[in-house]
């Protein structure tokens, strides 16, 4: 499978909105309206096969020491073949380039993230996320997502024994 993972462009926005919307309608991710994707376009990475969008995700910087992977989705037809891994690796590389030491995600698929060097943590250990976003979510008191985090900076990653190259070699 020949998949290209790259930073999103203006022309990708309608497909990103449609794909994320597909999963949002099922309650798997939060919706991202077009204006939100346009405003945050530089945060997005897309995966394409033969020019067609097959997956996407975004990296949101929350503070100097922390970023979040959001809206990670892959079309069902190519799930399980490494597209999600490639998107996450692209987002981790961007976090590394920006020198953000840690990246987290809230997910219903912690096993996927564990294979990429993420560890489970209590949501309460992410107070910036809780106060900024979670407090306003309709699922706040009954959240079914698991918080996972991993070190990105070479120093932090080596302390955890998980360099990005160890999990992102293609």
Language-model features, listed with the residues they occupy:
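A short helix-loop-beta-strand connector motif used in the catalytic cores of GNAT acetyltransferases and
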Residues: 36-49, 68, 141-144
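Cysteine-cluster motifs in flexible loop/terminal segments that predominantly coordinate metals
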Residues: 131-145
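Short active-site oxyanion
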Residues: 3-4, 97-103
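Short, hinge-like loop/turn segments at secondary-structure boundaries
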Residues: 23-24, 120-123, 139
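Conserved acetyl-CoA-binding loop-helix of GNAT-fold acetyltransferases
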Residues: 74, 80-95, 105
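Conserved beta-strand in the GNAT
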Residues: 46, 52-61, 65-73
């Amino acid at each position: 499978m020949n998949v290209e993972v790259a930073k999103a462009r203006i022309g990708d926005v309608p497909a990103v909105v449609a794909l994320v919307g597909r999963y949002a309608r099922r309650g798997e991710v939060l919706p991202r309206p077009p204006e939100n994707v346009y405003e945050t376009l530089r945060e997005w990475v897309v995966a394409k096969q033969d020019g067609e969008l097959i997956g996407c995700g975004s990296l949101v910087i929350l503070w100097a020491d922390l970023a979040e992977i959001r809206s990670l989705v892959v079309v069902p037809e190519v799930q399980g073949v490494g597209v999600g891994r490639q998107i996450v690796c692209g987002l981790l590389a961007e976090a590394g380039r920006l020198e953000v030491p840690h990246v987290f995600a809230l997910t219903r698929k912690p096993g996927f993230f564990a294979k990429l060097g993420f560890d489970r943590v209590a949501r309460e250990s992410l107070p910036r996320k809780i106060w900024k976003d979670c407090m306003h979510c309709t699922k706040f008191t009954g959240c079914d997502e698991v918080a996972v985090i991993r070190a990105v900076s070479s120093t932090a990653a080596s302390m955890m024994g998980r360099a990005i190259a160890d999990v992102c070699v293609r």
